[in-house]
């Protein structure tokens, strides 16, 4: 109740609404609802209890524009890598009651919050007319984004053409994720000026103590001596272990067995107390942010949310046993050279053949895996089934190559854009290049020589869009030995020796 009272006091102090007679409402009066939650640190400790009073936006009339972007995780890692390269300091700020800081463009009427009485004594029926945005309104995220974006752009910040939530000037970078903001800066005076101007514009925020250590549930630990940043999600891993009841399990050395996981149509139904989709959701957030080592295993189990069998639940337990052993691990961001973009790409041709029933389209599908690095640090990775059926190993490899290029080229564009604006040493500006490492000779030949035959013409027309970048020398496609293929652990289950060798290369441990 204390958190709820604090919320109402904050909203009234902010001038969020005006109390009016109910007869003044020009549109439907919307009900509200309370949302209570416990905010935790990345390590799972309780940070604070929060209460939000929200509008039932699902009952709104009309179809207003609602889209509001958030920063991509590849941009977060780009931010970290560039801050290490430049040896810039970092910090984060959290805007207080963010959505209610934006002015509402069209009036909205809501009922009085349950448990709180009117400030008048005449006994008339009262409601609230919103002056500012409020949580739950469909337009609230968009209004807040436009409000906070204007606060930064008015100070000379530019939006990246590739990520609207990545802002920069010559000596400072900013990440926007709703009300959480990450900042990297060259000088303390740059930061002081930025924060002072935000305050002058009426924005309320709290600056986190120290460096950029906690962002969206991920803990960042900087080692100034070795110039590294370690990303971990110990709190989420512990939550997964607790949710599956595997606190006392026997740990595994790898997250997946070497046999591919299939549909198992005749298998017994899952018989566990925990929610399969809920655990998969947490595993997906973990695998896409700090743990590429479980990406293949998680991609496999994520196929069966609609009808999980006992074998699929067992596969999740295998992942959890591995996480139990490596609960304090994550990914070490360590610069190994210049700011080159490298892409390791691999494919597993028809890996589900014999595992999924012949009538299932997935039984003939191949798997794509790729890891894109910047300065030797992983910035983006993927393990997924290909959307179309490849007719040969060559076609599967080439499809994977094309998919990775579609992701890598925009990253290169963003890097070039940001580096041009930042005050980077000349040696970094002159060494930006793109390299793609492929271990299939046929795919390598097609990508570099463009030898079109009757057998390859039909898929080259569709997937060979990147040829101009290869021909101009902007992108180099190079041969790599299979034993050095970083993406190998994204396409199949591996034995412990091979798996740990690749994990060391990619994640640093």
Please state what every model-predicted region is.
Residues 155-162, 182-237, 242-244, 324-326, ...:
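Polymerase palm active-site segment centered on the conserved acidic dipeptide of motif C
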Residues 39, 99-112, 135-139, 169-204, ...:
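Catalytic palm subdomain of template-directed nucleic-acid polymerases
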Residues 1-135, 139-161, 166, 243-245, ...:
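Chromodomain-type histone methyl-lysine reader module
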